[in-house]
Amino acid sequence: MGYSKNIASGMFAMLLLASAVLSSNPHPLQDFCVADLDGKAVSVNGHMCKPMSEAGDDFLFSSKLAKAGNTSTPNGSAVTDLNVAEWPGTNTLGVSMNRVDFAPGGTNPPHIHPRATEIGIVMKGELLVGILGSLDSGNKLYSRVVRAGETFLIPRGLMHFQFNVGKTEASMVVFFNSQSPSVVFVPLTLFGSNPPIPKPVLTKALRVEAGVVELLKSKFAGGS
């Protein structure tokens, strides 16, 4: 009997611990916590708060997404981030945004946001939006041409891309449920990492000759 009670008590303790670990970020305990980006303290899941007397009066507003980005890039696109690093007022609030502008034929290459779900709205033009499922869904590609005023949803951690299929410029605005969603660009990560992934790993994984890997690495030298 005592042995059974000990097992039950142990399982209850483990459930409590799992609940604490898996719960979402705690709600803020103050109206505002403007990030002290210059602070020396170690930050964990957020930044230290500035004293409100030093925060100014414009931390709730930003005009950084008002201007289109320069799409004269190798991908033909430009991402303008508006996360906690650019908008300290979002600290502890669990939200951020970005704007992506596309030249005709431009792409936001396959990438992952490891810390956030994404909701986007196409503001101009038409974009092919693709979301790749995991092995659980058979690596299925979910895709659709999304036009101005239409929206799309990308679950946290799934690889996705956008491609301008129109003949004119396109743009979109996306929203994240994290103040710092981060991003992993798949081509850049594979072929432009620092230090580089060993060539035999890539040739074996991609089932190609070493020369193909060298060519791809040359395209992403310097992290571009």
From Swiss-Prot:
Glycans are attached at residues 70, 75. Its main location: secreted. It catalyses: oxalate + O2 + 2 H(+) = H2O2 + 2 CO2. Mn(2+) binds at residues 111, 113, 118, 160. SMART domains: Cupin_1. GO terms for cellular component: apoplast; cytoplasm. Residues 63-214 form the Cupin type-1 domain. PROSITE patterns: GERMIN (PS00725). The keyword rRNA-binding does not apply. Keywords: Apoplast, Cell wall, Cytoplasm, Disulfide bond, Glycoprotein, Manganese, Metal-binding, Oxidoreductase, Secreted, Signal. The keyword Transferase does not apply. Produces developmental and stress-related release of hydrogen peroxide in the apoplast. May play an important role in several aspects of plant growth and defense mechanisms. Associated mostly with highly substituted forms of glucuronogalactoarabinoxylans. Belongs to the germin family. This is Oxalate oxidase GF-3.8. It comes from Triticum aestivum (Wheat).
